[in-house]
Amino acid sequence: MAAGPLRGLAVAGGGESSDSEDDGWEIGYLDRKSQKLKGPLPVEERQETFKKALTTGNISLVEELLDSGISVDTSFQYGWTSLMYAASVSNVELVRVLLDRGANASFDKDKQTVLITACSARGSEEKILKCIELLLSRNADPNVACRRLMTPIMYAARDGHPQVVALLVAHGAEVNTQDENGYTALTWAARQGHKNVVLKLLELGANKMIQTKDGKTPSEIAKRNKHLEIFNFLSLTLNPLEGKLHQLTKEESICKLLRTDSDKEKDHIFSSYTAFGDLEIFLHGLGLEHMTDLLKEREITLRHLLTMRKDELAKNGITSRDQQKIMAALKELEVEEIKFGELPEVAKLEISGDEFLNFLLKLNKQCGHLITAVQNIITELPVNSHKIVLEWASPRNFTSVCEELVSNVEDLSEEVCKLKDLIQKLQNERENDPTHIPLMEEVSTWNSRILKRTAITVCGFGFLLFICKLAFQRK
């Protein structure tokens, strides 16, 4: 193999920042035109030549230098070994040669292992997978964490590699371990928006209810990062995928998870997981994948499916068993309606503090659902406006309704602010009353927090409706 220039620098895997990002690997050419060593070299020059042979991928020269006596685990500047560098650029052949020459697959520098470096490499999943297979075959531990307590499976999930995730689990990687911030592999996949990895982790037994240190579940992390498909999928209580592959033996897992279609092109061997749309994600979560073709044939979208009644489902050829699954899921997704008639009359002074607080919590929750619905429309409308049949009604009608909504939300916001001021006034009067016994600080703080949150939510909903109105006006 001819020597060539280095195209990029090797950086520490896992996003760890340090003053050693180049790790002593300089851009340049081999000084010697020949791939053969013409004679013995001094130790320092021999190490420099070894480093340049690694950066250019000159395997024949690497082997010759190893034959001349240089150690395969030679540490270069900042402590990286030749195997760590080869893994960081997903050079499969170089990794194989170094391992065959006795390189330590379990080496780590400041808890940065070779396996972590390989999992966080910038390369195709095919090359990364092959490098990791080689390292695991030499007993690299898939559960050793870095300084931030991130394990290899977390890096693979973060970077969107479902096949790598599956391989690591098949070799004993813990699915639900947490890093220093409480993130699991599933949390990382949800945060980055990798749907295929999320589905694979759920099959492998990932627990979607594990919370981060700030109390967020993977679904909430997905929502915060605007990955609404993943949020909707993870929000479903029913999860037929969970643990589907968990009881398989190691050999069965590897065989099942890495099986590919031999008729596919080589470049697509490791891309067997296609991107799912909204409808596919919903059906997959309910174990109703077999309905996908039927619904697409009848041109039934997810939004249409979510509005269908039981008799409509039956007319479209959906079996009673599948109907039950769909109706149960729809019930979970319904926005809880506030029954204002059940609220005791304030004028009769029969309302309790708990009932009033419960009312505010329900109101706040419903506003949150409405905000999410409007956000979905704002997200989809500019990109998929061709899917909305505007011919059914004039766009001016939509704008007019939006204006009324904004006006109503402004009125609601004004009334909530009045309510907040009134409660604050009553609270101040009670505190100044010498006969009043003050409540615990935590209770008043919590009530105040609920009121503030409700007011902010209502104001935010009004702002979103205003943006929605502008979007319709542009159309």
UniProtKB/Swiss-Prot annotation:
The modification Phosphoserine is found at S17, S18, S20. Residues 1-25 are annotated as: Disordered. One of its GO terms (cellular component) is pi-body. Pfam families: Ank_2 (PF12796), Ank_4 (PF13637), SAM_2 (PF07647). It comes from the Eukaryota. Plays a central role during spermatogenesis by repressing transposable elements and preventing their mobilization, which is essential for the germline integrity. Acts via the piRNA metabolic process, which mediates the repression of transposable elements during meiosis by forming complexes composed of piRNAs and Piwi proteins and governs the methylation and subsequent repression of transposons. Its association with pi-bodies suggests a participation in the primary piRNAs metabolic process. Interacts with DDX4, PIWIL1, RANBP9 and TDRD1. This is Ankyrin repeat, SAM and basic leucine zipper domain-containing protein 1.
